[in-house]
């Protein structure tokens, strides 16, 4: 049997929607990263972009274990003197819940030229409404093969 070269295929990208209510942040981010990369497809190649679109709803209702709400910190620097910014996960969930999921997924993707392409296909919303109804997204929870760790 010959190996399929994904570069020569006409890749049809699916749209998936997932409700993050009550889901663990790390497990959810792992699943999303794998779908964005296309690891669930039989013709996956690490150097070819074959992934799908993912819509995440209710980003503010994710859960974390242990004391991560108070102990986990997000740090960034503005490149100005005294410009170190530090925020806890609890503050981020109250003010920027979309950013929490976006950062968790981004840090699970490979750090190469494809990372920016993968991240463009991730859509995160705090409420239960989204503006991608025209793409007819599939509910990810119905696909049990991808959802085995939850």
Curated annotation (Swiss-Prot):
GO terms for molecular function: mRNA binding; structural constituent of ribosome. It holds the Pfam family Ribosomal_L13. Disulfide bonds: none annotated. This protein is one of the early assembly proteins of the 50S ribosomal subunit, although it is not seen to bind rRNA by itself. It is important during the early stages of 50S assembly. Part of the 50S ribosomal subunit. PANTHER family: LARGE RIBOSOMAL SUBUNIT PROTEIN UL13M (PTHR11545:SF2), RIBOSOMAL PROTEIN L13 (PTHR11545). This is Large ribosomal subunit protein uL13. It comes from Persephonella marina (strain DSM 14350 / EX-H1).
